[in-house]
């Protein structure tokens, strides 16, 4: 795995995590 692939993998994971966080916050807003 070269550096570019590693960066891509980290960015992809960060994007998924942010989407999950946004969805979680949205769900809290709906419940509240």
Swiss-Prot record:
The heterogeneity suggests that there are probably two distinct DNA-binding proteins, as in E.coli. GO terms for biological process: chromosome condensation. Signal peptide: none annotated. It comes from the Bacteria. This is DNA-binding protein HU. It comes from Synechocystis sp. (strain PCC 6701). Keywords: DNA condensation, DNA-binding. Belongs to the bacterial histone-like protein family.
